[in-house]
Amino acid sequence: KLTGYYKYIPKSVNRGGHGELTNGKMDKCSIYIALCKWSSRFRVNTQTGTFVDLNSSDIIAYGELSDAEASRTDMKEYEKFEIDIKYRNLTTEPTYILIVASASKYGDYFTGGEGSSLYIDEFELGFDYNAASFTNE
């Protein structure tokens, strides 16, 4: 489980347009964690369209901030978040931990609201057993 505190101040999307975020809509943040089986570090390259494929079999486990939490527009103070990590593969040992926090969910596609701000504090990666992490629900 990944926990921490966040404060998100979104702006209207005024750059690009990707997925559900088009010009004029309110920006969304993104916080996620993935446990990966890679042979070396993964390098994102926006010029060649090289991005992490979160549906790849190399992603052993994954968890993300809920859409409702990522869409908040009324935050005045830091608020706690908890992201459960769901395992997709119980037999492969991951080699990398990937943690992403972005003020614009599709910032890697050059989409977002200029001035959207995401503040993060007290990241903690918990290792207590959680049965829910090992189900496909």
Model-found features: residue ranges?
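Surface-exposed beta-strand edges and their flanking turn/coil or helix-capping segments
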Residues: 17, 46-48, 98, 111-116
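Short acidic, gly/pro-rich beta-turn/loop elements at beta-sheet edges
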Residues: 13-16, 41-45, 93, 109, ...
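Extracellular-facing segments of soluble proteins and assemblies that are Gly/Ser/Thr-biased and enriched
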Residues: 1-40
